[in-house]
Amino acid sequence: MEKTVYSALGESVWHGRLPNGLHIYVDEKPEYGKQFAFFAACYGGMDLRFRTEDGHWRDTPAGVAHFLEHKLFDTEDGNALQILAANGAEVNAFTASSLTGYYFEGTDGFAENLSTLLSFVSVPYFTKESVDKEQGIIAQEIRMGEDNPDLAIYYMLLEALYQTHPIRVKVIGSEQSIAQITADTLYECHGAFYHPGNMVLCVAGNVDAKAVERIARNVLPGEEGAMAERDRPAE
């Protein structure tokens, strides 16, 4: 990893790219009491159509990226949110049009928590039962969003600005679109976009950059993975 010093800001950041393609950024702050880690995939609500290395185009229902964000917390060992919380970390996630991010902060157990974060995001575990249950949960979230005037105005603006570009589609999807999502859909989209070459890890706080790199090397796959080709109409 190489260190870049930003003299005007009084800051320095370590950056490196692992052989598997993962970009890592670390801001060492030894005087801080907390550690913060952010792990993100360049995959979001507008990535509805893509082509994988077999050459075939896939059309996926609106809301898959957000649905995937919810379900990745489920692991064979239990719920990752509960595992991290039990180890003293505050954890959350979000899905935007072009990005899905998972993050935590805490004061203790950083190495273990970082390993957990990298593991549950990169190793999917879906069942038909859990997907069916999540459809009801997200449907309720969709209905709640319909009562949010700010959100309604935002998407009305996008629909007026774009006629075909998928950024006009709601990240969360609709009740009709999420009903089409299956465990196979989630596995396919995870395989297409959740590989190290399409992801970034950012860490800040009382941490050691070399230790962060070592954990990432140990937990994540060693290969970069094939990049899916996205279909984003020019508009």
Each predicted region: which residue ranges?
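His/Glu-rich zincin catalytic helix
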Residues: 1-80, 187-235
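Charge-rich, well-structured scaffold segments of protease-associated domains
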Residues: 17, 75, 79-232
